[in-house]
């Protein structure tokens, strides 16, 4: 099949949408999600026709969900042939969506979307692209808005589908399905038809096939147009709230690797609308998208604010939210197993513990030390007070500690609680000890019992380097 460069009204209309939302710029490299159905075939043809105008590089991704058997295989072959005819790079992904949905506890629709966008992002990285184009149209917006209303939604749900969302663009978002069908017919383009779209087994299909036609017939209105107009108006309201949310996010949230945290009191002080958006934004920073994160999840996270420390909830896609003292943390689930270690400290010498770090220890005369404040990872001890073998170890039941500046002893567990050290981090904190007597909780505090005083003559120096 060959696509002509003849100009139709469709192309001008899509071009207006592209310019209105600043979707495409010169020299963009665009990864297109092409199923072979009417919408994606139309988008492929339109963007191919605009290829020269913007000097675009186009790449096609097709995902076989392994749901429709032989029909799905023919869809892939159809799209591959299109790409061959048009001399466009073709990338095929296959995933057993029913199995994945069951494994991840998602609907097939959610699992399918997850796999598709993962494939788009993977291809984007592979080809050095900067945009992802998907073929949602005006009817999809209306259907999504109605579906969200039926499920219960906020402002974001009433917008339906954004024309531009990060690096994702939707060139057909202002085009009705009937316009797409006419365009394909006029250009003699024959899409693949997924007959499950015409079965009223699913809620979205019922909305498309029954609810919208019924409302339009009974109330004599263009429901698709009205809902799309409402969505466009609310998009501007949403943009304002998002800008406000970003401002607050930058003020009170702290990103640390694969986790993000916020002070509980700072979050509580925000308006409820901003609080919910902040939670969604925190999840987005960890996961890269918010698909699958529903209203109930957000409320569960906010309820954590009034729960005891170490309270935790699971979120979709192996993300968790937990309260750590006065912080709310959202992060990828940690899979670390409990560690146990115990090594005799070499004096003098270097003691290495895999996954924990290195300990350099040596003894000097007190006259050789001119500064006892070298930071949290270098400590000085009265060597004459140390009786017995010194080890570096992980915590054990019965460990006791006399923190510097305190009389008497306390359980190590109580010290960890006082210092607000998260429970899951405690096994990884190395302890310098003599038997059950802690000499130094590395990175935190040394023992009062082994401090250097006016009678000290020999000093044990221990330097810790984290691995």
Curated annotation (Swiss-Prot):
Pfam families listed in its UniProt record: ATP_bind_3 (PF01171), TilS_C (PF11734)
Localization (cell): Cytoplasm
Recorded catalytic activity of this chain's protein: cytidine(34) in tRNA(Ile2) + L-lysine + ATP = lysidine(34) in tRNA(Ile2) + AMP + diphosphate + H(+)
Protein name per its UniProtKB record: tRNA(Ile)-lysidine synthase
Described function: Ligates lysine onto the cytidine present at position 34 of the AUA codon-specific tRNA(Ile) that contains the anticodon CAU, in an ATP-dependent manner. Cytidine is converted to lysidine, thus changing the amino acid specificity of the tRNA from methionine to isoleucine.
Enzyme Commission code: 6.3.4.19
HAMAP family xrefs: tRNA_Ile_lys_synt (MF_01161)
Family membership noted in the UniProt record: Belongs to the tRNA(Ile)-lysidine synthase family.
Cited InterPro entries: Lysidine-tRNA-synth_C, Phe-tRNA_synthase-like_B3/B4, Rossmann-like_a/b/a_fold, TilS/TtcA_N, tRNA_Ile_lys_synt, tRNA_Ile_lys_synt_N
GO molecular function, one term: tRNA(Ile)-lysidine synthase activity
Keywords assigned: ATP-binding, Cytoplasm, Ligase, Nucleotide-binding, tRNA processing
């Amino acid at each position: 099949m060959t696509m002509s460069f003849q100009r139709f009204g469709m192309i001008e209309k899509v071009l207006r949408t592209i310019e209105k939302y600043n979707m495409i710029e010169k020299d963009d490299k665009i990864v297109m999600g092409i199923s072979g159905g009417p919408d994606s075939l139309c988008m492929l043809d339109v963007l191919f026709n605009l290829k020269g105008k913007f000097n675009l590089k186009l790449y096609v991704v097709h995902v076989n969900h392994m749901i429709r058997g032989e029909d799905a295989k023919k869809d892939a072959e159809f799209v591959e042939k299109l790409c061959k005819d048009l001399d466009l790079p073709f990338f095929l992904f296959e995933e057993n969506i029913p199995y994945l949905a069951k494994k991840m506890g998602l609907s097939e629709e959610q699992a399918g979307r997850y796999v598709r966008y993962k494939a788009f992002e993977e291809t984007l990285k592979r080809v050095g692209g900067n945009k992802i184009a998907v073929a949602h149209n005006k009817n999809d917006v209306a259907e999504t808005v109605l579906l969200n209303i039926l499920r219960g939604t906020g402002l974001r749900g009433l917008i339906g589908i954004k024309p531009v969302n990060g690096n994702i663009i939707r060139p057909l978002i202002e085009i009705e399905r009937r316009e797409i069908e006419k365009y394909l017919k006029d250009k003699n383009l024959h899409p693949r038809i997924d007959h499950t779209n015409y079965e009223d087994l699913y809620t979205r299909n019922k909305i498309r096939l029954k609810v919208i036609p019924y409302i339009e017939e009974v109330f004599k209105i263009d429901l698709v147009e009205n809902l799309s107009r409402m969505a466009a108006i609310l998009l501007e309201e949403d943009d304002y709230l998002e800008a406000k949310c970003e401002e607050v996010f930058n003020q009170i949230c702290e990103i640390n690797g694969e986790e993000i945290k916020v002070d509980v009191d700072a979050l509580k002080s925000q308006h409820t609308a901003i609080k919910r958006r902040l939670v969604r934004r925190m999840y987005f920073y960890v996961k890269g998208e918010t698909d699958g994160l529903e209203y109930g999840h957000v409320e569960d996270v906010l309820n954590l604010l009034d729960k005891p420390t170490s309270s935790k909830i699971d979120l979709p896609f192996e993300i968790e939210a937990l309260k750590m003292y006065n912080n709310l943390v959202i992060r990828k689930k940690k899979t670390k197993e409990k560690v146990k270690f115990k090594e005799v400290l070499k004096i003098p010498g270097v003691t290495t513990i895999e996954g924990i770090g290195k300990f350099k220890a040596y003894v000097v005369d007190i006259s050789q030390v001119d500064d006892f404040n070298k930071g949290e990872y270098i400590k000085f001890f009265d060597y004459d007070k140390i009786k017995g073998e010194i080890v570096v170890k992980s915590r054990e039941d019965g460990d006791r500690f006399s923190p510097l500046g305190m009389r008497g002893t306390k359980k190590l567990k109580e010290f960890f609680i006082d210092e607000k050290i998260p429970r899951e981090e405690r096994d990884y904190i190395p302890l310098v000890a003599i038997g059950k007597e802690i000499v130094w909780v590395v990175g935190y505090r040394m023992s009062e019992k082994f401090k250097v005083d006016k009678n000290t003559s020999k000093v044990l120096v221990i330097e810790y380097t984290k691995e």
